[in-house]
């Protein structure tokens, strides 16, 4: 039997899974490859609370809107590996009850984009579509773990290419570093999908080799005080750190200019620090707190 194409395979699965899971989550089952709604969407009460405030944010510029939503998430507990929701199936998902550094900025941005839709479409289904747009290569989840953008620098390149964000890193004085891009291959036991699917390891290694073959451009932290005036509320700030003689992306958050005029770093801070989403100190000061932090990437949401 000839191999099914992706489009054929998805069409077949959509028909079958709609029948199997319609009672659990009408209208969502096909898009989420048969995973139950309560697996892919956690924290409905928090989502509804955000929707109730959406009218006051919807007319803000996308960056300010993203940061305003991020500000409402301050205090949310830090929780890692929230995207590892199944042994085999990859699907767009969210957990509003616990966020890591990546899902914090991602949830804030996806919700901000959802507010561009008519109000009757401010739904979990629409929100998950915005997550898919941002999280997956080319904006499409295929049901495969490999369709997710796992490295921030690849995410930035892909989203910049599609006109969703603007990569400001080089024009703000970046320098190239040798990209390490090896975390997943080295630490594969920490990833549920990779533990249960050993055959993924070779493909992940190929992906890391591709990402790592390109220089990682970053703005040295010594230059950050001089560019803070050029950064805007809602800019996505990726942290680059030393990895031996190489450099890798290690953390991410949002820029937010507070009422005192200071450009601060808003992020989901790990349990060894605050263990929750916080508005931290001035961005340049935050970088100087950690000797291993080398500098930053900057992406500006466009739509």
Predicted regions and their residues:
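Cationic-aromatic interfacial patches
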Residues: 31-108
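C-terminal soluble interaction/assembly domains
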Residues: 235-303
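N-terminal secretory signal peptides that target proteins for export/translocation
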Residues: 1-8
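Short, well-ordered loop/turn sites that connect or cap secondary structure elements
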Residues: 230-231
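Boundary at the C-terminal end of the N-terminal hydrophobic targeting segment
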Residues: 24-31
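N-terminal export leaders
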Residues: 9-13
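Acidic/His-rich structured neighborhood in mature extracellular/periplasmic domains
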Residues: 73-214, 261, 267-270
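Bacterial N-terminal signal peptides
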Residues: 14-24
């Amino acid at each position: 039997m000839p191999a099914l194409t992706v489009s054929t395979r998805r069409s077949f699965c959509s028909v079958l899974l709609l029948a199997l899971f319609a009672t659990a989550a009408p209208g969502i089952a096909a898009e989420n490859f048969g995973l139950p709604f309560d697996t892919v969407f956690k924290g409905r009460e928090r989502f509804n609370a955000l929707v109730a405030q959406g009218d006051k944010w919807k007319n803000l510029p996308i960056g300010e809107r993203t940061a305003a939503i991020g500000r409402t998430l301050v205090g949310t507990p830090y929780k890692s590996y929230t995207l590892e929701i199944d042994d085999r199936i990859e699907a767009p998902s969210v957990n509003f009850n616990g966020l890591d550094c990546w899902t914090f900025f991602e949830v804030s941005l996806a919700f901000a984009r959802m507010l561009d839709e008519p109000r009757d479409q401010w739904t979990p289904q629409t929100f998950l579509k915005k997550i898919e747009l941002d999280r997956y290569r080319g904006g499409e989840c295929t049901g495969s773990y490999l369709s997710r953008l796992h490295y921030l620098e690849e995410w930035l390149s892909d989203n910049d290419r599609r006109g969703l964000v603007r990569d400001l890193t080089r024009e703000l004085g970046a320098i190239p570093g040798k990209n390490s891009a090896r975390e997943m291959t080295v630490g594969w036991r920490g990833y549920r999908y990779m533990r249960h699917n050993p055959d993924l390891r070779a493909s992940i290694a190929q992906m890391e080799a591709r990402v790592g073959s390109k220089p990682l451009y970053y703005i040295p932290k010594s230059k950050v005080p001089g560019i803070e005036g050029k950064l805007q509320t809602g800019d996505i700030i990726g942290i680059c750190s030393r990895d031996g003689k190489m450099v890798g992306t290690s953390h991410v958050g949002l820029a937010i200019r507070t009422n005192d005029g200071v450009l601060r770093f808003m992020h989901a801070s790990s349990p060894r620090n605050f263990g929750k989403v916080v508005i931290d100190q001035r961005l340049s000061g935050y970088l100087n707190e950690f000797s291993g932090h080398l500098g930053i990437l900057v992406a500006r949401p466009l739509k």
